[in-house]
From Swiss-Prot:
The lineage of its organism: Eukaryota, Metazoa, Ecdysozoa, Arthropoda, Chelicerata. This is Dermonecrotic toxin LapSicTox-alphaIB1b3. Expressed by the venom gland. It catalyses: an N-(acyl)-sphingosylphosphocholine = an N-(acyl)-sphingosyl-1,3-cyclic phosphate + choline; an N-(acyl)-sphingosylphosphoethanolamine = an N-(acyl)-sphingosyl-1,3-cyclic phosphate + ethanolamine; a 1-acyl-sn-glycero-3-phosphocholine = a 1-acyl-sn-glycero-2,3-cyclic phosphate + choline; a 1-acyl-sn-glycero-3-phosphoethanolamine = a 1-acyl-sn-glycero-2,3-cyclic phosphate + ethanolamine. It holds the Pfam family GDPD_2. Glycans are attached at N250. One of its GO terms (cellular component) is extracellular region.
Amino acid sequence: WIMGHMVNAIAQIDEFVNLGANSIETDVSFDSSANPEYTYHGIPCDCGRTCTKWEHFNEFLKGLRKATTPGDSKYHEKLVLVVFDLKTGSLYDNQASDAGKKLAKSLLQNYWNNGNNGGGAYIVLSIPNLAHYKLITGFKEALTSEGHPELMDKVGYDFSGNDDIGDVANAYKKAGVTGHVWQSDGITNCLLRGLDRVRKAVANRDSSNGYINKVYYWTVDKRQSTRDALDAGVDGIMTNYPDVIADVLNESAYKAKFRIASYDDNPWETFKN
């Protein structure tokens, strides 16, 4: 999965997919009542990027729905996964469940079209704080009470705080999550970070009793760091330059071992070769 980083304006969906992304990451900010409000990152952000592009969240979802609904004029067949980077740092811990419920209702209405031929991409809810695990339970409760528990089949999870792997496992236990787990590791492109924790996450993924299904590394903009991440065995790379990642995947060393994921590749299944 080549994951386009910080795609917060509808026009950027086309831009990143056309550069080679088959997945995008979108920031979601919340208002003081825990409603998802804008797709917005703000300052500071990655080096070399404009930090202030934004849409109203529900409007972004409508644009995203068009991009992921077969038959629509804006449809991109290769856009198969969307990571919502949920900026819950503005919320009190006790608002996490409400944020999950409100997020689910927004998605149900504006993305999934109330279960009627809505957008088809897989969705990862990426949460920066382990204490906010109830966002997951709230999300699930809302979809169930709205009569669409089947949509949870399209939803996965990530805790993005670079926490200890054991602590992350514990948070999932509390949330009742037993699958659909993506594990991120990384840092802004302005700084360097080693691959030690990535290797631990990959080892967990590949062990018989691990909780992780997929591992992704962020934010990677250079060819050598792309090669290093691929050598470590990641499933996804988040980047500001999808074309760089695509180029490296075309190198003879990687062409035989990796391919770009399509809609038929289940992002919740651990890859066994």
